[in-house]
From Swiss-Prot:
Keyword Signal: no
Assembly notes: Part of the 30S ribosomal subunit. Contacts proteins S5 and S12.
Protein name: Small ribosomal subunit protein uS8
Gene from which this protein is expressed: rpsH
Function description: One of the primary rRNA binding proteins, it binds directly to 16S rRNA central domain where it helps coordinate assembly of the platform of the 30S subunit.
Organism of derivation: Carboxydothermus hydrogenoformans (strain ATCC BAA-161 / DSM 6008 / Z-2901)
Molecular functions per Gene Ontology: rRNA binding; structural constituent of ribosome
Length: 132
């Protein structure tokens, strides 16, 4: 079966594993997914991730993070720009997620970054997703 939106699949797998308190989740890898996983790690939404070479495209193993009483660190994930409807934002129109409590992941000409970093560097781009 052909996958039309691999990033939405990536976010859905993380969301589903998070809802049932899985320790880790494995997804097919790509450069964009690795960049998003790196941002999630830097922002403290996941414990860690690792890339596993399998002779094809590789696998990305993501270790989810929970609080001391099994509180979910990731409350929600939402895909914004989809293959059928791309969403772009100029540098002064970058969205704030929950008044700054969440992050928006933006694909800019200088790579994939958070909305805060893109705002600081004065860059706009495609709004990939919101995470809070």
């Amino acid at each position: 079966m052909v996958m039309t939106d691999p990033i939405a699949d990536f976010l859905t797998r993380i969301r589903n594993a998070n809802m049932v308190y899985h320790e880790k989740v494995e997804v097919p890898s790509s450069k964009v997914k690795r960049a998003i996983a790196e941002i999630l790690k830097e922002e403290g939404f996941i414990k860690d991730y690792e890339y596993i070479e399998d002779g094809k495209q590789g696998i990305l193993r993501i270790f989810l993070k929970y609080g001391p009483n099994k509180e979910r660190v990731i409350s929600g994930l939402k895909r914004i720009s989809k293959p059928g409807l791309r969403v772009y934002a100029k540098k002064d129109e970058l969205p704030r997620v929950l008044g700054g409590l969440g992050i928006a992941i933006i694909s800019t000409p200088k790579g994939i970054m958070t909305d805060k970093k893109a705002r600081k560097e004065g860059l706009g781009g495609e709004v990939i997703c919101y995470i809070w």
